C-alpha cells in the first residue's frame, strides 16, 4: 500500500510539472482582424478592389487549388456579384494568430450563402480563409470552399453572355 501511495504522489508531481509550450496568441479585436472584416464586407458589397490597398503586389492567392495573382483574385471575387445576389458570410469568425516564429495569419471562417441571379438556386457552404501577413500587408491568401455552385453558375453566366 505504501508503494501505491508513493507512486500516486510521484505521478501527481510529474503531472503538475508539465510546462506549457505556448506557440503564440490569438486576438479577434486587433487591427488585422478588423482589416479582414472590412475586406470581407467589401466583397459582400460586390467590390473587392479595396484589397489592392492591403495586398503585396507579388502575392499569391489560392482559391482551393487554383492559384491567382492579385488582379486575378480580385477580379474573381468581384465576378461573384455578377452571378449571385444576397451573398452573405453567416456565422463569421475572424481572428488573428501571432505565432512565436514571427508569422501572423488571420483566420476567417463562415458559411457562405447566396442566390443565383440566373437560376434562382440558393447555395450555402462552409468556408475557411487564411490571410498571411508580412508586416502590414497581406502576402498570401488561401480560401477553401466547395466551388461547385460558383463554377456551375459562372458557366451559365458565361453562356448567357454569348
Predicted regions and their residues:
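Sec-dependent N-terminal signal peptides
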Residues: 4-13
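Exposed beta-sheet edge and beta->alpha loop/turn motif
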Residues: 109-138, 142-145
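Conserved N-terminal glycine/acidic-rich loop preference
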Residues: 39, 51, 99-117, 127
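Low-complexity, intrinsically disordered terminal/linker segments enriched in charged
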Residues: 140-162
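A solvent-exposed, acidic/Ser-Thr-rich amphipathic alpha-helical stretch
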Residues: 47-98, 104
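Hydrophobic pocket/interface hotspot
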Residues: 39, 50-52, 59, 73, ...
